[in-house]
Regions:
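Extended polysaccharide-engagement surfaces of secreted carbohydrate-active enzymes
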Residues: 1-106
């Protein structure tokens, strides 16, 4: 998300690439492991890697005055986490320079 042409939320990027970074040990690096990002730990479980684990109901809308990004994180966790729904919503009110963050979960 941007405000007045400046980024409000950024990604720190990747570490230096090497063979291990593209191996089965990829998720031992902090830059790609979910426990070093702003993802919740649900009932002791972190988000899992792989195409099987993904957020759903991902949407983004934008107008001159407001930008909104919403997703349901439940699908990114193993069944053992026992999460039915975990909706995260970010709303940027551009003219007021306010970023509103909310989460609802079951």
């Amino acid at each position: 998300m941007y405000a007045d042409g400046e980024p409000l939320i950024i990604d720190v990027g990747a570490l230096a690439y090497n063979a291990k970074y593209f191996s089965k040990d990829r998720y031992t690096f902090w830059a790609v492991s979910s426990d070093y990002h702003n993802t919740p730990i649900i009932n002791g479980f972190i988000q899992k890697e792989g195409i099987k684990y993904a957020a759903t109901s991902v949407s983004a809308q934008g107008t001159k005055n407001k930008g909104t990004f919403t997703l349901d994180l439940a699908g990114a966790y193993p069944v053992e986490a026992a999460v039915i729904s975990w909706t995260r919503k970010l709303s940027l009110y551009r003219q007021r320079n306010i970023l509103y963050f909310s989460e609802t979960y079951i």
